[in-house]
Design a protein with these regions (language model features):
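Bacterial N-terminal signal peptides that target proteins for export
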Residues: 2-12
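C-terminal motif of bacterial Sec signal peptides marking the signal peptidase cleavage site
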Residues: 20-24
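Disordered, low-complexity segments in secreted/periplasmic proteins that are enriched in proline
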Residues: 27-47, 271-273, 331, 445-487
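Surface-exposed loop/turn motifs in large extracellular/passenger domains
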Residues: 42-61, 75-97, 101, 105-126, ...
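Beta-strand-rich domains and repeat architectures in extracellular enzymes and scaffolds
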Residues: 65-77
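Surface-exposed loop/turn positions within long extracellular repeat scaffolds
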Residues: 377-383, 396-406, 419-421, 426
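Extracellular, surface-exposed repeat architectures
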Residues: 416-438
Length: 487
């Protein structure tokens, strides 16, 4: 892992501004260019002397900077490019949040139109509004970045950004964002694929989870920490997979008045049009999930499958629950609960679950799982099915109320409490056979979004329902001016 303090900055002789325009798909760049015709203020500076550093250090030999609103320091447009041992600095703002968040306006490093951009041993610093650090936009576009450090300080300025079907592959990065609505690992309209292996990812701003997913995002062997927001947010028909990850979340500030709850992981559908409707997915294998404030999981206005296998889960908030599936301000009132399929494999899990009267839970315990907690201790009437495989167990910590149960004679330990199954008291030591609750993978209603998250959907959808989600392709014509703040 890179130590930020070990990045070397050396004395240098300022070179003349170097401007090169990215041309055909066959052209290849080699890391000494500021490659955007639109980036007229990008400059490159040589580092004339070098200092040998350790294996974890980054040796900087060139600097590229850009201070023009809306422009890039580096742009790869339909070509294969490689850069290494650079420091990239971006200041300036974007006039349009949509242009910046959807299409890469004002990002420090931008790849588009099927480009393949490889970055290694670089430092990226941005200080501007809507100044994302590294952006992959469009089908066929791939950014590969390794052994690098990214810092963003402005609002709405993520570390890694992927939209429009782009691909981002990251290895051993250190990313730190301090602005509001600035996730370390971000996606937006049109989604894409993000693969992260190794590194450290930290966010400090309000509305700045470590991961905000409207894509398929996989992170392995990494440390992730949010000091103000959720650790992970998944919106709509998208996914986050964590393998051997240490995730720490302290959601202690509100980015919206649509929900009163705090949580480590939020899974929802905003109805903004930025994420397709359908089944959201959260998978975590190994590693740890530590929550400092509120609940561990919150699901609202969407259907989701959550799979946890051999994860150490700690909730430091004694008043928080493990899972809350409930209505909030997104979607249509009365039809915007959470619908959850929860799979626990080889888990020791402690924590209560709350499923409100318009929400649904199917919980499956397998592979020697022990769950200690209460489900709907206040009898809030949500539909709940529990299935306990032989060798797994549910230990009650309070009276609990569920709809249906499948277990063998050893699957339930009442522990002095009462379990009601569809209103009938369960007798410990008996078998039970029930049926899962059908979950339909669609969200309900149209709703605005929290400040810093996607806004209202476009008008013109039939019957008051959302239309097809945008593909992420840039619309024709001039870009919109202004635009709402984004996540």
């Amino acid at each position: 892992m890179i130590n930020r303090k070990n990045i070397k900055t050396f004395s240098f002789i300022t070179a003349a501004a170097l401007m090169m325009s990215v041309a055909s798909c066959s052209k290849s760049n080699s890391g000494t260019e500021a490659s955007s015709a639109s980036s007229e203020k990008a400059t490159v500076s040589d580092k004339s002397s070098r200092e040998v550093s350790g294996s974890d250090d980054i040796e900087i030999s060139k600097e590229i900077s850009n201070d023009e609103d809306g422009a890039h320091a580096i742009e790869a447009d339909g070509e294969t490019s490689e850069y290494s041992h650079l420091k990239v600095t971006k200041t300036g703002d974007s006039d349009s949040g949509d242009e910046a968040d959807f299409y890469g306006d004002n990002s420090a490093i931008f790849a588009t139109n099927g480009a393949i951009l490889t970055l290694s041993d670089i430092v990226v610093d941005t200080d501007g509004t809507h100044a994302n650090a590294v952006f992959s936009y469009g089908d066929g576009t791939t950014v590969n970045i390794s052994n690098s450090v990214i810092t963003t300080t402005g609002n709405c300025s993520g570390g890694l950004m992927t939209t429009g079907g782009g691909t981002m592959n990251a290895t051993d990065l250190t990313i730190h964002t301090t602005g509001n609505s600035s996730a370390a690992i971000r996606s937006d309209r049109g989604g894409g694929t993000v693969n992260v292996d190794g590194g450290s990812y930290t966010t400090d701003g309000k509305g700045s989870p470590v991961i905000y997913s409207t894509a398929d995002i996989t992170v392995s062997n990494a440390v992730m920490e949010s000091t103000s927001s959720q650790g992970v947010v998944v919106e709509g028909k998208n996914s986050v997979t964590l393998n051997n990850v240490e995730l720490i979340a302290d959601n202690n500030t509100k980015n919206s008045d649509k929900s009163e709850y705090y949580q480590a992981v939020m899974i929802y559908q905003s109805m903004s049009g930025d994420a397709a409707e359908g089944l959201a997915t959260f998978n975590m294998t190994g590693g740890s999930l530590t929550n400092a404030n509120g609940d561990v999981f919150f699901v609202n206005n969407t259907a989701t499958t959550i799979t946890l296998e051999d994860v150490q889960i700690v909730n430091r908030d004694a008043d928080g629950v493990f899972l809350r599936a409930a209505a909030a301000g997104w979607g249509s009132s009365g039809a915007n609960g959470g619908k959850v399929n929860l799979y626990l494999k080889d888990q020791d899990l402690i924590g209560d679950m709350i499923v409100d009267d318009i929400s649904t839970l199917n919980m499956y315990l397998s592979s020697g799982t022990t769950y200690s907690g209460a489900i709907n201790a206040d009898n809030s009437e949500g539909q709940i099915y529990v299935e306990i495989e032989s060798g797994s167990k549910w230990v009650l910590t309070e009276d609990s109320y569920i709809t249906s149960l499948t277990c063998d004679a050893d699957g339930i330990e009442l522990n002095g409490h009462t379990l009601y199954v569809n209103g009938v008291e369960y007798t410990q030591g008996t078998t039970s056979s029930g049926e899962a609750i059908e979950i339909i993978s669609e969200s309900s209603g149209r709703s605005g979004s929290p400040d810093g998250m996607p806004g209202d959907p476009p008008s013109g959808s039939p019957d008051g329902k959302p239309g097809d989600p945008p593909s992420g392709e840039r619309p024709e014509g001039d870009p919109p001016k202004g635009g709402p703040d984004k996540k």
